[in-house]
Amino acid sequence: LLCAVSLIQAQAYKGKGDIKGQVGANLQDHGTGIFFSGDYGVGENMSFGFTTNYLLNTTEIEGEKADFGDRFDLKARFNANLGNVFKLDKKMDVYPGLDLGLRNFGAHLGFRYFFTDGFGIFSEAGLPIAKYDEDVYGFDHYNNQFVFNIGASFNL
């Protein structure tokens, strides 16, 4: 049994064919919510995926509450999984990337650490590079500003 346990190694990114799922908290100015993402490895250091989040708690603006469209976001993304490039422990991965969403074209930087082969934690920060609307005001700032995500990561 001891030999079998020692052969199990947690690995944050395995390369082509690797599938990751993440769920966590989304934190941004005047709003907090839930974050989901999925990534699929297409090469040794590349993955494509999606993210979505929904703000559960938002600040009223001029007495109005944010509606579903203000609270929801969906993005397609590309990651460069660089843990092995930086010679990090196999349990760790650093992944900068680009994303194209409902509100902007942006960039993100994330970090994963796996405790077991199936479970780990992640943190990720993102910001818009180009907003689709130059006159952003009120609820348009939601999901269109600096965001921070933190939570659990899973090998699927």
Per-region residue spans from a language model:
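Solvent-exposed loop/turn segments connecting transmembrane beta-strands
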Residues: 22-34, 66-68, 97-108, 136-145
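Predominantly the C-terminal beta-signal and adjacent terminal strand-loop region
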Residues: 51, 55-62, 112-156
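Primarily recognizes Gram-negative and organellar outer-membrane beta-barrels
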Residues: 11-26, 58-63, 91, 96, ...
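Hydrophobic h-region of N-terminal signal peptides that target proteins for export
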Residues: 2-9
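Short glycine/proline- and aromatic-enriched beta-strand/turn motifs that initiate or cap beta-hairpins
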Residues: 9-48, 78, 83, 145-149, ...
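Gram-negative (and chloroplast) outer-membrane scaffold detector with strong preference
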Residues: 39-117, 154
